Amino acid sequence: MRHYEIVFMVHPDQSEQVAGMIERYTGVITDANGKIHRLEDWGRRQLAYPIQDLHKAHYVLMNVEATAESVEELETAFRFNDAVLRSMVMRTKGAITEASPMAKAKDERDARRAAISERSSEADEVEENAEESAE
């Protein structure tokens, strides 16, 4: 079996169905005794250029170990699914399991937001305590 990196973009109006699509596509891989090494749902993102007059799409990244037949089946499923705007399948030298730069950036952004909200809630508590002691 070979290692592949698969990225597909879904129409933004179909974002609710992405979970089902991921389940169906990972099922194609696992049914053929393949392995999913990394699966990241990047969510809606801005496109670099419009595709079918759309400026956003829902991105999904998968790193898999699979047979060529199951990857062909996936590509066919992408081609015949109107909700999939674009897809790309690349063969890689080995399994990639660490988080992608996109996922790392999202984690850092979430951590910063959590720290900011924590600081603001602490400041609110200090203000409330100051008001109570003034009364």
Curated annotation (Swiss-Prot):
Q: Which NCBIfam families match?
A: S6 (TIGR00166)
Q: Which HAMAP family match?
A: Ribosomal_bS6 (MF_00360)
Q: Name one Pfam family in it.
A: Ribosomal_S6
Gene3D superfamilies the UniProt entry points to: 3.30.70.60
> Could you name the domain of life of the organism this protein comes from?
Bacteria
Which gene is the coding source of this polypeptide chain? rpsF
Classification via InterPro entries: Ribosomal_bS6, Ribosomal_bS6_sf, Ribosomal_S6_plastid/chlpt, Transl_elong_EF1B/ribsomal_bS6
Name the UniProt key words of this record, in alphabetical order.
Ribonucleoprotein, Ribosomal protein, RNA-binding, rRNA-binding
This protein's GO cellular component annotations are:
cytosolic small ribosomal subunit
| Compositional bias per record (Basic and acidic residues), positions renumbered to this chain | 104-122
Protein name in UniProt: Small ribosomal subunit protein bS6
